[in-house]
């Protein structure tokens, strides 16, 4: 069987790849009966030369491959009929903007293996970039804090070589005594937690977070039953929340009263209560002034996220009084970082990690 590593063609350019040269060598060693070629790319984080030196043929023609492996959606005009493809199609949730892509896949007799639905026996996703979204999202939040307050300056993550370089930059800054709230329990939240821990920011209990003032920056990581409560007052399990979200209301405002920087790393399920609404954000008791919305659900559970932002222009402001977008420098505006393709800013690490998961 012949495998081809495809060139990423989506715009804006995505430098990630499923297999680094080293990981592709492991693939070849693990499955010696396979043949592997790499489509030439001038944007990939690993150069054509790096793959050639690792022993792989570089080609412009993948028509004789049986299986083609990529990261993001393949443009319709680049799809090759009668092939097996691995990539994120962004069609699983019936996204209307990719309806034509799905139709083309069917018309061209393509077998699609979507990374998003490759799971274990319990239904847990095996492949994804959540960790890297959390890592970069937390970093970008601190970068936004420095820009908003004009107290320190951090380079864009995309201009740094790798994760250690990113952490080195964070450890050059001095933070005020802020309270940082992190929601979630999955890969995204764990990635953000890695950043907070690498900065030696102390983690505190919910009780202390809500009631105690500190003379240093601290953070608290919370899950669904911490920021939601049953309407009838019962305290049950996470499973009950997932199965009966309509039986719950948000209990997030107790955290919003004391939080300075909020990192949204949770998964928001359909029918779940919004964490905070536009009316909540207008309250005198709403203290959050910076949101890194890694989850990036537009006009939904995090009211200040009006739109996704971009790597080129990652932050904007949200005016609680008008519920409108303003410049992030506007007094009293909530600063919002809502980039929806964060792993692209850490392409080398994300690619290395992707290959580990894939094999």
Where are these regions (language model features)?
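A structured beta-alpha segment of the ubiquitous adenosine-cofactor-binding alpha/beta core
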Residues: 50-64, 222-286, 339
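An N-terminal-biased, well-structured beta-alpha scaffold segment characteristic
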Residues: 2-104
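ADP-ribose/adenylate-binding Rossmann-like module
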Residues: 81-116, 261-322
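Phosphate/diphosphate ligand-binding glycine-rich loop within oxidoreductases
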Residues: 67-149
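Glycine-rich phosphate/diphosphate-binding loop of Rossmann-like nucleotide-binding domains
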Residues: 10-41, 153-258
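Adenosine-phosphate binding glycine-rich loop
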Residues: 111, 116-168, 290, 295-359
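Short, ordered loop/turn segments at secondary-structure junctions
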Residues: 9, 40-43, 73, 117-120, ...
């Amino acid at each position: 069987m012949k495998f081809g590593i495809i060139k990423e063609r989506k715009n804006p350019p995505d430098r990630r790849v499923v297999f680094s040269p080293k990981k592709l060598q492991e693939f070849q060693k693990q499955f010696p009966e396979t043949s592997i070629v790499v489509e030439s790319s001038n944007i990939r984080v690993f150069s054509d030369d790096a793959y050639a030196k690792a022993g792989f043929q570089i080609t412009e023609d993948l028509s004789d491959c049986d299986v083609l492996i990529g990261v993001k959606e393949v443009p319709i005009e680049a799809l090759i009929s009668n092939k097996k493809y691995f990539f994120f199609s962004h069609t699983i949730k019936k996204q209307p903007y990719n309806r034509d892509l799905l139709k083309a896949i069917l018309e061209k007799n393509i077998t699609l293996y979507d990374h998003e639905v490759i799971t274990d026996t319990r239904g847990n996703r095996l492949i994804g970039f959540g960790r890297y979204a959390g890592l970069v999202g937390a970093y970008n939040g601190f970068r936004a804090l420095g820009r908003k307050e004009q107290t320190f300056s951090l380079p864009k993550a995309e201009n740094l070589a790798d994760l250690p370089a990113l952490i080195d930059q964070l450890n050059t800054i001095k933070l005020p005594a802020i309270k940082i709230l992190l929601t979630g329990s999955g890969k995204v939240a764990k990635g953000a937690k890695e950043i907070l821990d690498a900065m030696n920011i102390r983690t505190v209990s919910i009780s202390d977070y809500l009631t105690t003032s500190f003379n240093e920056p601290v953070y608290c990581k919370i899950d669904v039953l911490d920021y939601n409560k049953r309407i009838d007052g019962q305290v049950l399990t996470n499973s009950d929340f997932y199965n009966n979200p309509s039986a719950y209301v948000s209990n997030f405002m107790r955290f919003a009263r004391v939080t300075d920087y909020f990192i949204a790393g949770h998964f928001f399920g359909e029918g779940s209560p919004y964490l905070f609404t536009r009316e909540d954000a207008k309250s005198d008791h709403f203290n959050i002034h910076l949101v890194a919305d890694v989850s990036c659900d537009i006009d939904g559970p995090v009211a200040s996220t009006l739109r996704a932002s971009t790597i080129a222009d990652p932050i904007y402001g949200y005016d609680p009084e008008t519920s409108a977008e303003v410049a992030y420098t506007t007094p009293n505006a909530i600063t919002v970082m809502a980039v929806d393709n964060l792993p692209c800013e850490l392409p080398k690490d994300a690619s290395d990690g992707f290959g580990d998961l894939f094999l």
